[in-house]
Amino acid sequence: DPELTTAQSKYVESLARAGASVRWVELADPDKAVAVALECAGLLLPGGGDIEPSLFGQERIPSCGEPNPLRDTAEPKLLHAFLAADKPILGICRGIQVLNAFLGGELYQDIKPLEHVPHNDHWAKIHTVTVRRGTLLAEILKQDTVLVNSQHHQAASRVAPGLEIAALSEDGFIEALEKPDAKFCLGVQWHPEWLSEADPRQQALFDAFVNACH
């Protein structure tokens, strides 16, 4: 096991409360990563840096962060492998962007000029999202609005075919996407792992993911 950062340990703790153990997958060899990951019951796509814009059909703008070629190469393979195997997928922050970008959607490379509520550098709860009724997310959270933290400067723009919007921020940015025809495929733009210890509604996301893995 790698020596975990505080951010990584939050995922482990949230999943452990739901009754799951975590296996970290080395991405240096993407095909090997897929083979190893498919031994697991589900895939969590965690937060991280920006995605290379050319991978979703755009030219990089100056405010786009440095991409992570390792993750940009391996994560789409992992995503498609788990969808093909009909295994549960939970995407968090960068993870929701991976879902959208690599299933044929597009991203805002920088939402800063467009935002009306704070979206970056807030690990504590900072803004409200509205959950769409009838979605998997609504079934999990069991409420129409939820107060979330926010730690991103990119967001889904054009939604990928097959994905549906499950939640929006107060200023209209996509905060959750899901794939209704999958066993369990849900992405959220916030970081529930930083809130789940104190907030049962945020822990419910991990509980539902782990339940789907059984």
For each of these PLM feature ranges, what is it?
Residues 95:
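Active-site helix of classical SDR
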Residues 104-108:
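Post-Walker A helix-loop "phosphate-sensing" segment adjacent to the P-loop in P-loop NTPases
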